[in-house]
Amino acid sequence: MSTAENILEASDVSIQFGGVRALADVSFHVEKGQVFSIIGPNGAGKTSMLNCISGRYRPTKGQLFYNGHSLARSSINDRARLGIGRTFQNLALFSHMSVLDNIMVGRHHLMRNNFVTGMLYWVGGAQREEQEHRRKVEDIIDFLEIQHVRNEPAGTLPYGLRKRVELARAIAIEPELILLDEPMAGMNLEEKEDMARYVVDLNQELGKTVIMIEHDMGVVMDISHQVMVLDFGRKICEGTPEEVLANEHVRRAYLGEGDAPLQEELVAQ
């Protein structure tokens, strides 16, 4: 049963591709205001779960509820309008568009005037609306400290900055819940520290609930309120970072028989 304090609930979610079951009867809930991390080895089903939440995949079994309402009939665009934003493991920016224009794309579903009416009535409401959207985009640019590249083509930026631009575009949707798929993958230590700070600020200053997939266990343990562990499409553990850290099943899933404890791996980081 859905409750008001839970922004997202998953009940027995399963998805199968041919003979491969990517998710098997996964249930969990995310409370409003949490940073909820999903971890697990490669191929565990983490991105498949985000794809089910965002609407890219339809579960073959089970239900998803967002703010108490079933997502069964909701398209990707419907979910964006409801307040679900998303970044991707592989960057999906428009390389030849400026940083500012890439972020503006995230506000498309919030615009009352389409392109044609905007051209016909530019001097009226459409112009004012455009200015308001640009003001909000500029606020996001300031928040993520990318003012110095706002007019640069996104494709010319270093990888770490492009990841920030994609996060900015997800924020531009004005989501209540934001899904982050490996936001720190491929980054150096300094870039990871910056991105971790932005995720914390996104949660604490902007009040966004975050569901995050991340392989850097040090970051996960530092900034998460709750952690769920998947392995071969099944949930093997869920709890606070400390509870997950102490779980024997988690150590086996990550490290296998006879390897060093997960605690030692984290200390080494």
Please provide the spans of the model-predicted regions.
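Glycine-rich phosphate-binding loops of nucleotide-dependent enzymes
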Residues: 2-269
